[in-house]
Every structure is written in structure tokens, then in C-alpha cells.
């Protein structure tokens, strides 16, 4: 009886300590992320000092304009706020989304090495995007490219196809799902390489995009991707308990 009370008391003490530790870790990582974004903004063909980046943010932040004013050229201000800042934010946002998606895959397949390549999701997205460009469907509508839409369609169709192939009766064995995904991923990768050989000029339009380049990222790209990333993250968070049980 005494041992049970003691263990319960220790658990109550350890829970707040763990929570406090995790909060401190998250705070430290958040500060590190902000610093890395600021540093990355100053790196490029036209280098900008760290202090100048800070001054631009202080001068252009609502509520701080009246408190801070620094004589900064309009060229540096435009370069930071209109070109490099959206790229840095989009890179951080995409990195967070990939981390969340990777965690979900690892929990779903009970494998710490699982990733979007496991069931062909990435190769399906690449095939959808390149097919859109090759067929002349990679247009821009209201300032937003349709390539991400076709990439999403290709990804979703591939996942559903792999799931259907792997289904045995009313069950989907994890091993069969993984093997089917790897096979489909190799097949679609070969098709994308075939596009590169047969249509080199058109493929060049999407080559850097497939490698994850943020060279042409603008604010509209960030705002168009934000709802999908937040929505997907919320859905995954709602199934956190189920993923923990699977893992």
C-alpha cells in the first residue's frame, strides 16, 4: 500500500517536470529556428549583415515603426521582405510539414525508417507534376501554379492504388504494402527519368522544383500552401493517440 502511494506521488511529481522540460526544449528550438531564419536571409549572392536584417524587421514591424528607425536602402528592404523572407518562411514551413508527415508514416508503419517514399507517395507526386508540365497543363491560375495540384492528385492516386494492390481480403498486410509501394516508386521513378530523356526542354521547367528549390517562392506561394499544411497537421494531431497505439 505504501509503495503504491509512493509510486503515485513520484508520478505526479515527474509529470510537471517532464512538461516543463519539454516546454524549455520547444522554447529553445523555437529561438534557434528564428535565429536560423534571420541568418539565412542574410546569406546569398548579395550578402546582408545580420544587424541590417534585424533593423529592417524592427523598422517594418507594425507597432515598432514609431520606436525604431534606421536609415536602410529600399533595395535591401525589398530584397529582405519581398524575396528572401518568404523563401525562408516557406522553407521552414515545408520542413515542419515533412517532419509531421514523416512521424505519421513511422507511426503508421511501425518503422522508424519509413518515409513518403515507402509507399510511392513522393514518386507519385513527382509523376503528377512532371506529367502536367509535359502535357502542357502546368499553367498558372490567379498567380498560383497548378503543378502542386497535379502533384497532390498523383500522390493521392498512388497511395490509393498501392493500398488496393496490397489488399488481401479485408486486410492490408504491412509487409505487402511496403513492397508494393517500393515497386510502384521504382516504376514511377523510371517514368520520370524517361520524361527527362524524351522531353529535356520541358522537364527542365520542373527539375529544380522536384529537387525542392525555393528560388521562385513568393508570398502567394506561402499563403496558398499554409491552409493545406495546417489542415493536414490538425488531422494528424487528431489521430495522435491512434498512431501512438500503433507504434
Question: Where would I find each of the regions flagged by the language model?
Answer:
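Alpha-helical transmembrane segments in inner-membrane proteins
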Residues: 2-247
